[in-house]
Amino acid sequence: MCTIGTLRLGRHEYLLFKNKDFGRDSFADQIFLSEDVVGIQGVSTWANSDSSQDQFSGFSIGANRYGLFCCDANVREEPATGWNYDLLTEIALREGTDVESAIKAVDRAVGRHPYWCSNLMLVDGVTSAAIEVHGSEIAIERHTERLTRTNHHLLFGARPMDEDTITTESRLSFSRERLTNANSIEDIQGLQASHDSNDKTTGICNHSAHQTVYSYILYCKDGEMSLLVRQGRPCSGSVYHCLTPPIGNQWSQEGEALFRSSYPSDSLV
């Protein structure tokens, strides 16, 4: 389960955030890097307790050289013939140069083959959008300033067979409330670590059936991109690693090596 969202901080300043929740208490990210795109690889086996069975495909979150950011959140693995929605995040970043062209790329993709139900979040230097994916259909919500989603559809509607029917609505409420008053990266970091539920076991930071295993903030100001990433529960006091994605004008083999060696993931050490 995941909580995702966007926030515009100024005319040339914006961010995308994600808390990644898994059916286990730890996880090691895999990275894809090229001159054009950086992506944290998606995994279709997020609910499994056995990491040896993980199947990676697509991107869970990423950015491209044009300053387009995209991430996703699971709703349910329906239809049965659907493909992993992480592939749509990769398509958006490989084929899109901005939010609108990325939406068109996703629409073309679901027209060719159905994908599992999910929420995608996109932001660029002008606007942001949430794409709700429902098999071979999509629905769009646009907002210039801020958006958030969890693990159910708002435009298509929640369903009893959704993967999370327990925490998704409360997490959305908590995220919306905090995002309304957010005006800095520090506010988003506070949101990611928050426990606003009465029993403190969940909130945006999740300690319930699913555990928050990574927190991400992709940030752009005046064309300069950075990735703030933290492994483990964000309320635990662990620090964010601030990395410069080596894409576009920043691309070099040395930059790629530095990014990989600095990224908090046991599998990359």
Segments predicted by a language model, with ranges:
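A gly/proline- and charged-residue-enriched helix-loop-helix capping module
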Residues: 91-104
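Phosphate-interacting basic helix/loop segments used at nucleotide- and nucleic-acid interfaces
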Residues: 105-115
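C-terminal, well-structured catalytic/ligand-binding subdomain of enzymes
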Residues: 1-94, 115-118, 123-269
